[in-house]
């Protein structure tokens, strides 16, 4: 889930699509599911267009950026569907940027509600250069070692969903916000500096320009095919416990959407059994439906990677309420204001 420049990509109807394919649906999405050729988004958007005649217009940006854009367009909405990650989806709901919509599949998806639904499971992860480091950093304390000075970087909380997840993971791993902030203040001595993009850090790790960075499991697994020196790890706390914050892709219908019915159709399409079954095969993600268990090698690799790692999630509504204050405090303790 990297934060890229907000880019507009239009996914046009297949040549075989019906001649009545004049209607459109516009998606504002966090990135990660449209990476590379034959991505899950690309395959599903093409199939949706072929089945319905509705063209998908796709706008991509960071988790916070796409929500900020929706807020700016509140009086004249341009998007129909929002895909982002916690806590930004909760912020969108609190700011009344999402419309009430009960999907056809809500009963099969844990944590779905009348404003948004999980779309693809995902988890915070960390990566290291396995060519330059014989073993992964075992603990959070290891990351404070002087050998990582200017060789460690994580994306900026508040801008990137994965960067925000690092901050929240520190709270969890150290037992409190105060302890988490104290640690992040110390870690700043090794941090290269702010990064608006999580995804671009992978190439830097692969080339050895930095040794360690943050990421997310789905994105990192997909990137490892093109970045052979990169491996995934999770640092342990002082009890030796490794944990990973669950940060799913989440989808919702935009309040006042210009093509609301088309938005509903696309949401239901992406949450269908057929679409969910292929998310691991095409994009290394994990389906959110309780009645879908893929059998492909990508799914097996993702589940194997998480062995011995405890997944967790906070009360996201509480996180959304305190997010602005937490981001301000992060800037203060890291002296990055």
From Swiss-Prot:
GO MF annotation terms: thiamine binding; thiamine pyrophosphate binding
Gene3D superfamilies found in the cross-reference section: Periplasmic binding protein-like II
Function as written in the Swiss-Prot or TrEMBL entry: Probably part of the PhnSTUV complex (TC 3.A.1.11.5) involved in 2-aminoethylphosphonate import.
Extent of the signal sequence: 1-21
Statement: the UniProt record of this protein carries the keyword Transport: yes
PANTHER family: THIAMINE-BINDING PERIPLASMIC PROTEIN, THIAMINE-BINDING PERIPLASMIC PROTEIN-RELATED
Species whose genome carries this gene: Salmonella typhimurium (strain LT2 / SGSC1412 / ATCC 700720)
Location relative to the cell: Periplasm
Induction pattern: Induced when inorganic phosphate is limiting; this is controlled by PhoB.
Keywords: Periplasm, Signal, Transport
This protein's GO CC annotations: outer membrane-bounded periplasmic space
One GO biological process term: thiamine transport
InterPro entries, alphabetized: AminoethylPonate_ABC-bd, SBP
Full protein name: Putative 2-aminoethylphosphonate-binding periplasmic protein
Note: Maps to a phosphate-starvation-inducible locus previously known as psiC.
Protein family membership: Belongs to the bacterial solute-binding protein 1 family.
Pfam families per UniProt: SBP_bac_1
Signal found in the keyword field: yes
């Amino acid at each position: 889930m990297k934060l890229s420049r907000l880019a507009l990509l239009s996914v046009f109807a297949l040549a075989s699509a019906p001649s009545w394919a004049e209607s459109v649906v516009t998606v504002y999405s966090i990135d990660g599911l449209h990476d590379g050729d034959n991505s899950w988004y690309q395959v599903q958007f093409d199939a949706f267009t072929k089945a319905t005649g509705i063209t998908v217009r796709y706008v991509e940006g960071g988790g916070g950026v796409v929500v900020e854009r929706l807020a700016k367009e509140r009086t004249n909405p341009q998007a129909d569907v929002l895909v982002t990650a916690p806590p930004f989806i909760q912020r969108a709901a609190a700011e009344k940027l999402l419309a009430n919509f009960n999907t056809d599949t809500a009963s099969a998806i844990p944590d779905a509600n009348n404003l948004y639904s999980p779309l693809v499971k995902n988890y915070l992860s960390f990566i290291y250069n396995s060519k330059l480091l014989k073993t992964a950093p075992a603990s959070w304390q290891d990351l404070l070692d002087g050998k990582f000075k200017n060789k460690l970087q994580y994306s900026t909380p508040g801008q990137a969903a994965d960067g925000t997840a690092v901050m929240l993971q520190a709270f969890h791993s150290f037992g409190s916000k105060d302890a988490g902030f104290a640690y992040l203040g110390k870690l700043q001595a090794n941090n290269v500096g702010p990064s608006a993009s999580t995804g671009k850090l992978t190439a830097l790790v692969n080339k050895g320009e930095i040794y360690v960075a943050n990421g997310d499991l789905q994105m990192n697994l997909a990137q490892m095919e093109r970045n052979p020196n990169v491996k995934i790890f999770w640092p342990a706390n002082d009890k030796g416990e490794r944990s990973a914050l669950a940060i799913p892709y989440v989808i919702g219908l935009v309040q006042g959407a210009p093509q609301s019915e088309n938005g509903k159709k696309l949401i239901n399409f992406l949450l269908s059994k057929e679409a969910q079954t292929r998310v691991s095969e095409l994009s290394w993600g994990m389906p959110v439906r309780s009645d879908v268990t893929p059998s492909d090698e990508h799914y097996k690799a993702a589940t194997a990677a998480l062995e011995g790692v405890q997944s967790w999630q906070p009360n996201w509504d509480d996180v959304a309420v305190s997010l602005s204050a937490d981001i301000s405090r992060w800037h203060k303790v890291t002296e990055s204001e």
